[in-house]
């Protein structure tokens, strides 16, 4: 039985929006990368963003924690609500937003310090030193590493340099680094692209383990991965949202011919 088959059935997770966009458009200079995207991503599920290169899926993912804004030539219109709050409201703190919406990148990017210091990096960053005790930090490290399945392997190596770990362990550690600040949403931009088959399988299994406690949104070019490792899929093309459905429905009975053409490998 697959790990997905052992996970909580989708109908057992209450339907509640985790991320909602309305008429979201984004320009890089004069180039429009997103065109009036309206989508509702369900809380507690795994949603894959799929489509050919340049379709806008990574741009959309990075809108959800406003990472795109680090580029000075970006303009955005429309609305994004995270847990029913518009993230473009004037009173929204980017620091608080990025605590709630963590991100994992294509290549593992552990800090060049110990495993222990990697895990508590965010907690130290967002807390006053006087508010943190050694026992609290120790507990946070154990809990986070347990959640990602690394505690048994690394509990005796917490002082080891994180960059010396295997790539799969590094990527799991990057996920663990998000957890002590209690995110609601975890964004993943092709998190398995640097991993081998076994590493990919391990990250996909971890995603199913985290599902329900967190909302996961993943960008992937791998159609088999999207089908194996997500509850719902959003298919994008040329900056537009073409189709958003439960994963099996989208793959078995796509409503839009463009979706069918992409799934069948006719372009992309």
Please name every model-derived segment.
Residues 79-86, 132-156:
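Conserved ABC ATPase "signature" region
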Residues 68-72, 90-92, 117-137, 149:
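ABC-type ATPase nucleotide-binding domains, specifically the catalytic core motifs of the NBD
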Residues 73-75, 86-102, 212, 250-254:
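ABC ATPase NBD coupling module
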Residues 186-189:
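Catalytic Walker B motif of ABC-type/P-loop ATPase nucleotide-binding domains
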Residues 50-52:
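The feature captures the beta-strand-to-loop junction immediately N-terminal to the Walker
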Residues 160-165, 169:
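Conserved ABC ATPase signature
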Residues 244-245:
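ABC ATPase "signature
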